[in-house]
């Protein structure tokens, strides 16, 4: 694999760290700024809002720019957002800085996926995407715990300064390792990128992302009370178990990339089906300490097996405008985050028990499997129609019959 993929992984590591570290620093931020914990929670929402808005907006705005230049520019914006977060004097300015930090997130992964797949042979495209996302999953194992510990020991502002340094390393790596684009811009331009989003298969793929990863976040958003109240873990053990989730996500990400290069659609269907099964088993697994640990590990594997196939599916269905479509897929991931957490919260509020968010997630995963099935049926129908047109076009005319 090209060494340039390392530069994309470094950027992904920084983005993954800043996205998730705020959840562990909320009490420290709330105390320092003199705000309530729910008010501090809006800092997580501000970042997610930046991702959803920035993913399609920045991808569209930079459609005619060199992709290498776009990636470097996005990381400059990322560094600026995190540096401003570290220097924010109050809650309002921190909200704005977190929103700014989220803006480049989706566009970086969207454009990065296109760059990654263009650097490898066709049979290694999914693996190249999974290697870029490796930075994101490793961030959950090492980046987030270390950054959280740094924030607790040195103050939360030190964490964002540290993330800014990671961003600077990513900028240097991108400048050194990503090949220069010979063409000044993608051939399709903005019009072609936007036209690609009019395709029904693209929207079905995005719908699969929202439902499938909504299933993950329905359970993951409430994983702490499941581990403490159901499985019997102490609060101090949760951080280690979340790192175990990162291990599972890393395994699933690499496995999904390798399998998808051989059979993309079966990998997607298999991943979603396994996610349904894992989430359905949560009420049983969360009755013991070892079962709880196994549930967390399997959740990471099952969810992230689908990551590369989903990204590749969106890019293939939007071949005329892969950058914008891939960035829109990142926005779909964050919609899944918000929608999944909301769905899991409804199950909890209804009094169905502490593991009910996982059961709700199983329903969402089944919905994602259904949407993927509809997408498959649409593809088959279109392929049959095209085959029929080809046969008709190549069928010679029969000579007229002579009547006596």
Question: Model regions: which residues?
Answer:
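Cytoplasmic helix-loop-helix junction between adjacent transmembrane helices
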Residues: 97-136
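A late C-terminal transmembrane helix in Major Facilitator Superfamily
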Residues: 317-354, 361
């Amino acid at each position: 694999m090209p060494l340039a993929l390392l530069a994309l992984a470094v950027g992904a590591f920084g983005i993954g760290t800043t996205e998730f570290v705020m959840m562990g620093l909320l009490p420290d931020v709330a105390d320092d700024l003199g705000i309530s914990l729910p008010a501090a929670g809006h800092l997580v929402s501000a970042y997610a809002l930046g991702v959803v808005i920035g993913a399609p907006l920045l991808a569209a705005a930079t459609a005619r720019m060199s992709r290498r230049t776009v990636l470097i520019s996005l990381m400059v914006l990322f560094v600026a957002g995190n540096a401003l977060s570290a220097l924010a004097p109050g809650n309002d300015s921190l909200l704005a800085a977190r929103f700014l930090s989220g803006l480049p997130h989706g566009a970086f992964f969207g454009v990065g996926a296109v760059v990654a797949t263009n650097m490898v042979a066709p049979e290694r495209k999914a693996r190249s995407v999974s290697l870029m996302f490796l930075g994101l999953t490793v961030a959950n194992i090492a980046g987030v715990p270390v950054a959280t510990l740094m924030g607790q020991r040195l103050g939360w502002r030190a964490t964002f300064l540290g993330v800014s340094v990671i961003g600077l390393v990513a900028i240097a790596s991108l400048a050194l390792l990503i090949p220069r684009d010979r063409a000044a811009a993608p051939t399709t331009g903005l019009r072609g990128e936007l036209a690609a989003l009019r395709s029904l298969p693209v929207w079905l793929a995005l719908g699969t992302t929202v439902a499938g990863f909504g299933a993950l976040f329905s359970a993951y958003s409430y994983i702490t009370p499941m581990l403490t109240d159901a499985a019997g873990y102490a609060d101090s053990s949760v951080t280690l178990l979340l790192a175990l989730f990162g291990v599972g996500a890393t395994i699933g990400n690499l496995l999904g990339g390798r399998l998808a290069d051989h059979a993309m659609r079966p990998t997607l269907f298999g991943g979603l089906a396994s996610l349904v099964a894992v989430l359905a088993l949560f009420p049983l697994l969360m009755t013991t300490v070892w079962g709880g640990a196994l549930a967390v590990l399997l959740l990471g594997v099952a969810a992230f097996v689908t990551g590369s196939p989903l990204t590749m599916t969106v890019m293939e269905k939007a071949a005329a405008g892969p950058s914008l479509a891939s960035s829109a897929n990142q926005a779909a991931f964050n919609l899944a985050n918000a929608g999944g957490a909301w769905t899991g919260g409804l199950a909890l509020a209804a009094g169905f028990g502490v593991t009910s968010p996982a059961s709700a997630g199983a329903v969402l995963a089944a919905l994602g499997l259904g949407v993927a099935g509809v997408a498959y049926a649409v593809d088959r129908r279109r392929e049959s129609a095209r085959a029929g047109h080809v046969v008709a076009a190549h069928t010679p005319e029969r000579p007229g019959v002579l009547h006596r």
